[in-house]
Every structure is written in C-alpha cells, then in structure tokens.
Amino acid sequence: MFITPKLQSPSRNFPQIFTNLVPFCLFGWLASINSLEAQTIALWGKPTCAVEPSDRTLKDNLRKTNNSAYPALIAKHKDQITECRSQDPIKTQALWLRLYAKDTKPEVLADVLDRIVNRGYNTVFVDVFYDGQILLPVSDNPTPWRSLTAEAVKAGKVAADFDLWAEVIRQGRDRGLKVYGRSFAMDFGYSYSQIPDRASVLAVNGRGETSISKSQLNPNANAVTNGKASNLEPNEADRVFIDPYNSQARSDFAGAIASLLKRQPDGILFDYLRYPLTKGLANNVKDLWIYGEAARNALLASMPDAGTKQLMAIYLAQGEIPPKAIAMLQETQQKITGMTQVRSKNPAFAAKLSEKFLWQLAVNHAYQGVLDFANVAIASINLTVNSNKNLGSKPAIGAVFSLNGNAPFWNRFPLSMERHPMTYALCDDGKCVANEVIKVINASPKAVVCPVLAGTWGQSWRGHPSLETQMQAIRAVAPQINCISHFSFEWVEPESDQERKAGL
C-alpha cells in the first residue's frame, strides 16, 4: 500500500537546515526553504475549499488541549466550507470512510472528521453494513449481524450502548458535513451463512453451488494488484450473496436499513447490488444464480402458460431442451386440450428456438431479481420515514456500482436512485475516467450522477492520476457534474487509517 511520507514542519527542521546552510549564501538558504515548501504542497495536493495550513495546525492543537476555542474554530470552518462549496462547480465533494473500534474515542473521531473538513470535503460516505457486521450499538441491534463494536464491548473497552453511527452523524453535522451510510446489499457476509435457518436464503446456481462453495480468485485479481480495478478484491471468499427473491433475505435487509435510518443520516448508498463474479460471460442457464428455491419458484410462476412452464422446468434441470422434450410436450398438450397438435417436422430446430427463448426469460429473471431487491430497499426507506415523522425528510438514495461488475443492469436502477459509478479506469491524463462518466450520463440522462474516483491528491497512485487531474478531465467533458466522491480516507490519509486499525 502506498504510504505518504510523514513530513516535519519547516520550523522543526530549522536547526538542522541552519547548520547545513552556514557555509552557503542567503540565496541558497531561501532556495532550500522554498524547495521544502514545494514538497509539502505537492504531497497535500490542491484540494478545492481546503482549510488554510495555519488554521489546520491551530485546530489540531486546540483539539488536543481541549481548548474552549476549539468549537468556535470548527464553526468557522463549517461556514467557510459551506460558502466555498456554494461557489465551486463541485457542490458536493465526498470522501469514503470506514470506522473502527478506536473511533469510539471522541478525540479520535474528531481528528478524523477534522482531517476530512481540512481537505475541503462537505460530505462523507460511512460504511454502515459490510462484511457481515453493522454499525449499530450492541444493546440496540435487532438484526442478524454482529455489531462493529461487539469485540470491543466484550473486552470491556466500549459501552454496549455506544452508538458510533449516531455519533459520526452528530459530529459530522457539527462540522457542516452531510453524512451518508454506505451499505452492502446482496452480499450479507460469511457470518450470515452460519445462521442455521438461513441456508435456504443464499443464491444458488444450477450446479448447486453457493457463492461460498463457488469462491474463487477474482478473474481480475491482477488488475487489483496493479491498481486497475480498485473496487475489486483478489477473491470473494467472504462474499456471501443471497437470493434476491427470498422473503427472509428481504425482511432481514429491510429491518437493518430501518434501524440504520433511525439515526437520521442524510442519505444511504447501496453497494453490491449484483450476483457473485464469474469467469467470463455466462452462456449456460446453470451459470445463473436463479436456482434458490424462491428464485426458481418465482421464475416458473411467471411463465405465460403451462407448456412454457413445463419447458422451463426441463431447461433448468438439464441446462438444455432435448428434441424429444418438444415431442413429449406436444403429446401432453394434446391429451390436456383434446386438440390435435401440429407436430414439428424438425424437433431439433424447434428445441434450439425454445432454448433461445427460455434463455432470455431466465436472464431477464436474474436481472429482475436485482432490480426488485433495489426496490425493496427503497420501499423500506419510504416506509420507515413515512411511519416515523420524527425522522424528518427522506434521505437521498443511491446505488454504487462498477460499470463492468454490475453490467448490464446498472442502467435499469430506478431513476430515484443516484448513480455512483466507480470510474476507476487507468490513464495518465484522466480522460479514460471521464469517458466512463459520460457512458453513465448517456445511459441515465435523467438521474443524478456522482462519480467515484480512486486515488489521492497531488500525485499519481498505482497508475491512477491525481484526483485533481481526474476531476479536471471530467469537468472538461461533463461540466454538469457537480457531485464527486473519492475512495477513500484510507488512501488520502493512510497514516491515520493504519493507526486507527491497530485497535483500542
């Protein structure tokens, strides 16, 4: 992982600089100071609406000493960011953030949020449900998933009722930050699969495999290693995908979202609205994840007539339509209706035509499962907000997706969902990233599009150009884009992230 070098301030380096420069002229000393300042600026980059260096240092010192002037400086920066963003073309500049148990310490979370504001961000996307754990307090977690703070609570280091999700929303708003939750959708996490009565909830393909038994190296693993596809992971062994048609899965997920919404975030983003990754294109019905009991029953129930239903059942079971199945179906239909059936003169040809028709029905059914699950999430939000007037206005709703991993149904998401495409293409000038953004805009011209960029400020990272370069490229071809997010705090502030990961 790329680690930004830790720089000491020029004032702390002054004694050494002064000693080394005694033999040299004043011009040389000034040149050295200018060089050091340039290095600091290059590593910080040029984020728009950033807090001035002197104010950053002052705020850090005030926080560490618990000075009474700290809240006033926070309020000042809040007003400055609000004013600056209102005049900047990018009205919403967001940063992705994952919290850890150490963030339950008030001073740690305050430092994280101060760092985010310092770089000119006015929105933060917080991971609230991922890898089988949820950002709810142990004492108020009605979901099947483990609380993020469970281990810390068990160790006696965090109170069972500590609500980190509510706290980051409160502290974020104190600083003028809008706070969104980012939730995995169809990936429920490995721990969910270990619940005895949830085995039937998992997505299953035509070979009886779940995403656990099918776990494999990601076909794009090399791309992950060299930075070409930062949204993908080397393997999906811990990714447990559910059958989107399963009522238990829908109920569990709706309940989790309702609990998270009680903390009144500004928005909620849904990621992993897809099935498990597979090698290459699916070209056989048994490759599709529609063999769970709920998905299969829903597919058969949607068939237009009994004959098509019978053929689909054969197709699902055998992965093909044998010619003799056509003849058998005609005989069955004749017995049922009492009408003489016109026999096909070429059963093999009729079987192939039937396969093409049934294949399209099966593929559409798979797509529809994802779209229906997205609508379940939206319905859960609407129901929660409408049934509880204390929650205020309805939060923004968005879908996070990869243009490849979610192909080809991301453009079918409801228009009410913001588009947050992970535009992670690699090129020196950022134009390839801009091209991906244009692709999403053209496919969803009426939807809000807020691209997700990978990288860091002021420098390239594993082939990703600087965030400044990518944003300039996007603005050049899509000036209507006024919302952008950066993945992630871990890459922008690597030292802080590593220190917080270390635990309490």
Regions from the PLM with identified roles:
Residues 87-104, 180-262:
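Active-site-adjacent "subsite" loops/lids of carbohydrate-active enzymes
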Residues 119-160:
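Aromatic-lined carbohydrate-binding/catalytic grooves of carbohydrate-active enzymes
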Residues 214-385, 396, 403-413:
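Polysaccharide-binding and catalytic clefts of secreted carbohydrate-active enzymes
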Residues 402, 420-504:
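Substrate-binding cleft of secreted/luminal carbohydrate-active enzymes
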